[in-house]
Amino acid sequence: MLKYFGTDGVRGVANAGLTPEMAFKLGRDGGYVLTKDKKDGERAKVLVSRDTRISGQMLEYALISGLLSVGIEVLEVGVITTPGLSYLVRAQGADAGVQISASHNPVEDNGIKFFGSDGLKLSDAKEEEIEKLIDAPEDKLPRPSAEGLGTVTNYHEGASKYLQFIENTLPEELSGIKVVVDGANGAASALISRLFADMGVDFTTIATHPDGLNINDHVGATHTKKLQEEVVKQGAQLGLAFDGDADRCIAVDENGNEVDGDHIMYVIGSYLADHGRLKKDTIVTTVMSNLGFTKALERRGLKNIRTQVGDRYVSEEMRANGYNLGGEQSGHVIISDYHNTGDGMLTGLHLLYVMKDTGKSLSELLSDFKEYPQRLINVPVENKKDWKEHKRITEAIEKVEKELSDEGRIFVRPSGTQSLLRVMTEAPTQELADKYCEEVAKVVEEEMGSN
């Protein structure tokens, strides 16, 4: 288990757990690890970007200082989505990229996420190498002076290049369907109107006026109530919600019902399969995907492969075995024919394209998807790493597993980014899912609760 890196980089409360001093060390040590193999005389190039949090610039300047101190040339992208940065790293032939964002987390939090030259998140081994340098008793990294120091170049035009990339993944404009888009007051806020207008979409927006403090504030992919209300109020056929860094997309159908990542993958995957484009007739998801998703795919003759939680592991499975669609229930969807990471705006537009090309509403496209009732409880804990050592917890889980048999499941895991233990159940009825989830969550709270 890594000390600083979670499933989505290094996160913490800005200026408390994640300080400018830490950002400087991450820039210096991370930059060195990712560029140390450059040939003598070759300058390493790293792209840096952020979301709209008030703490973003504070951490950005500290991080960039660290990168400059080991002689790295920095391209400062400004505010852009995480998948936007990932794309630009590859498009620019950069050695690495760093996004400053805490995704769907509240404004108090922030994070620092590294990408390699391939635009992908780092391996555990690379992150461990960075952590060893952070904790080293003495800083022995190079300290160039004068012409050996790095410089910063403004690269705000990168946003336009990224939007052009997304537009080129679709064969035609997307007029004829009314859409409401929720930008979460995050990184996609300034991009949505440009992209959707260019694609000919009939759209309105909410939560696209960030002020540094309102990111994810009761809006976005994890708070869809306002979007659901707007879709019904405006008589729209589709709602699309992104999170703070727009690496995920949650939809809303024409009746105001939330449509999560499982449902989105089912719609896009079914369309690809119908056109002979779903590789190996398989969709890759994590263990958190609903049982109903797997059963719906089976009825269509399609397969579902599951990985541990984290879109990084979905991506690794897809690349290792040649699959082209995967993601998470939370809305990270990877369509690898176009992009190697979850991209909320790309996903949303391709979902819209399926609706237009089939002439069907979102609810019609999902008519064969029967979801198992599910319950998720996040339990704040003191130490999320040692939960398996608590006998009462493991016994409670075993009891539920025995009673549910193959008609449901229980899944317990630590959050990759917060001090939480997540307890999730699925069962034939909501009553049973609630009952079993509450039973186990109560034991977890009694054994490990932080309150």
Swiss-Prot record:
The modification Phosphoserine is found at residue 103. Binds 1 Mg(2+) ion per subunit. The keyword Electron transport does not apply. Its EC number is 5.4.2.10. Activated by phosphorylation. One of its GO terms (biological process) is UDP-N-acetylglucosamine biosynthetic process. It catalyses: alpha-D-glucosamine 1-phosphate = D-glucosamine 6-phosphate. Its cofactor is Mg(2+). GO terms for molecular function: magnesium ion binding; phosphoglucosamine mutase activity; phosphomannomutase activity. Mg(2+) binds at residues 103, 243, 245, 247. It holds the Pfam family PGM_PMM_II. It comes from the Bacteria. Keywords: Isomerase, Magnesium, Metal-binding, Phosphoprotein. The active site is at residue 103. GO terms for cellular component: cytosol. InterPro entries: A-D-PHexomutase_a/b/a-I, A-D-PHexomutase_a/b/a-I/II/III, A-D-PHexomutase_a/b/a-II, A-D-PHexomutase_a/b/a-III, A-D-PHexomutase_C, A-D-PHexomutase_C_sf, A-D-PHexomutase_CS, Alpha-D-phosphohexomutase_SF. Catalyzes the conversion of glucosamine-6-phosphate to glucosamine-1-phosphate. Belongs to the phosphohexose mutase family. This is Phosphoglucosamine mutase.
